[in-house]
């Protein structure tokens, strides 16, 4: 019975929040509020710099191989337990990461910036 009370309170709070957000204050949009602030001066140039897609790819590759290091480090301890399920899962994860590396080499994502 008390479980349903918690759910009911949660749903009422969610509905009230949705109501408040939908009826919330819609402020006037002004040029000054949407422009970047540079110590009270008008901006000299466009504040948005173009984003390098190559930099994004390098960051994603770094994250993938960082996760691979986290997977590889405990492998000697897993081998001591001699559990085949852990060994197969480790091999499968590393196989997927090697396939990703080959894909990156094929599409030259790992070349240096030109």
Swiss-Prot record:
A Pfam family matched in the record: Oxidored_q4
Cellular component, GO, one term: NADH dehydrogenase complex
Cellular compartment(s): Mitochondrion membrane
Record gene name: ND3
EC number(s) stated in the UniProt entry for this protein: 7.1.1.2
Keywords: Electron transport, Membrane, Mitochondrion, NAD, Respiratory chain, Translocase, Transmembrane, Transmembrane helix, Transport, Ubiquinone
Entry similarity comment: Belongs to the complex I subunit 3 family.
Residue runs in coiled coils: none
Segments crossing the lipid bilayer: 1-21, 55-75, 85-105
Reactions the enzyme catalyzes: a ubiquinone + NADH + 5 H(+)(in) = a ubiquinol + NAD(+) + 4 H(+)(out)
Record's function text: Core subunit of the mitochondrial membrane respiratory chain NADH dehydrogenase (Complex I) that is believed to belong to the minimal assembly required for catalysis. Complex I functions in the transfer of electrons from NADH to the respiratory chain. The immediate electron acceptor for the enzyme is believed to be ubiquinone.
Main location: mitochondrion
Entry protein name: NADH-ubiquinone oxidoreductase chain 3
Membrane topology label: Multi-pass membrane protein
GO terms, molecular function: NADH dehydrogenase (ubiquinone) activity
PANTHER family with a match to the protein in the record: NADH-UBIQUINONE OXIDOREDUCTASE CHAIN 3
